[in-house]
Structure formats: C-alpha cells, structure tokens
Swiss-Prot record:
It comes from Nitrobacter winogradskyi (strain ATCC 25391 / DSM 10237 / CIP 104748 / NCIMB 11846 / Nb-255). It comes from the Bacteria. InterPro entries: Ribosomal_uS4 (IPR022801), Ribosomal_uS4_bac-type (IPR005709), Ribosomal_uS4_CS (IPR018079), Ribosomal_uS4_N (IPR001912), S4_RNA-bd (IPR002942), S4_RNA-bd_sf (IPR036986). Residues 94-157 form the S4 RNA-binding domain. This is Small ribosomal subunit protein uS4. The gene is rpsD.
Amino acid sequence: MTKRNEAKYKIDRRMGQNIWGRPKSPVNKREYGPGQHGQRRKGKLSDFGTQLRAKQKLKGYYGNISERQFYAIYVEATRMKGDSGENLIGLLERRLDTVVYRAKFVPTIFAARQFINHGHVKVNGRRVNIPSYKLKVGDTVEVKDASKQLALVLEANQLAERDVPDFIDADHNKQSAKFIRIPQLADVPFAVQMEPHLIVEFYSR
C-alpha cells in the first residue's frame, strides 16, 4: 500500500484527531498514533514540526494528496491575488473530488476519487474522470444516470454526520450540484482546525 492510499483511519490516528468527524474513527476511542510506539507521550513540537503537521493534516484531509501535487497547488495559491492561505483552501475546494464529497454523493473523499476515476461523474453534461479537475463558479456536477441509484450514492445522501455547505447547491433528487462560489477558510466545514497560514510558513522557509 502506498502512502497516498494509506487507510483513512490511519491518518486520523497519526494526527491524533478525527479529521473528517466520522463516528467510526478510532480516535474516538483512543488518542494515540498507530503502531507499537503510538502510546508514547509526545513532546512539544518545534515551529517546523507544527508547520509540518499542519501540512500533513490538510493533505490527509483532501485524500492524502501527493506532495508534488500539493506543492503545485500551493505555488498556484501564492501567485494569486490575496492571502495565500485562503487561496490554498479555495483551490482545494474547487477540486472535483472535493465537490463530489461535499455534495454528499459519496461517503468519503477517498470514495470520491475512486467514483470519479470509474467514470460516474459529469461536469456540465460531460463525463470527467480526473479527480483534480478544477471547477469554476457556476459549474454543475452530476452523477451519471446509470449510477444515480447505486447504494453508495443513496447511503451518502443520508449521512447525518455532515451537511452540504452553502457554497454548493445540491439536489439529491437529481443527484446534481452547482458550485456557487469559492469558499474562504471560515466557510469550509472542517471537523478540526486547519491552519493554512502555517503551511505557507512551512514552504516559505
């Protein structure tokens, strides 16, 4: 198993936080990392360690994005006008896999990536199988007709653990969603605190 495909709950345990707010997370029962040394008391992190942890947590949240891809997103964020940390969040939220997850078409961000790869999703009426595809404001995302009644989709629609954020207009009767606006950090329903400014500091060293 590659690091990118690391089990989602292992990420929770490594971070010591339930980063997606899921009821089955092992962190709900124990707050230590994976492995035989997971229960050792951790010392105070250095500034570098705190910044690195913030980066690992955000990368993990968005499906364990590869370092190369994540850094490319960061570079794009720094070239945009405005706050680089806010821009970073906005770019991550514009990813197709993120919107499919936010719209509650699938239960997890990992499932969103697989769902898209398998050709179940259309953008503005055309099939797109690239999870990192960057949406624009006004784009419509929908589950293709043959996939709308899949158990995975119907069960995800009913998940009580999270709501569809207000920057996405989702219609579960049609299994479609419209990307209304690019959110800021405060708009994104993270289950734990995310600190993109620390990631900017990390890469700016």
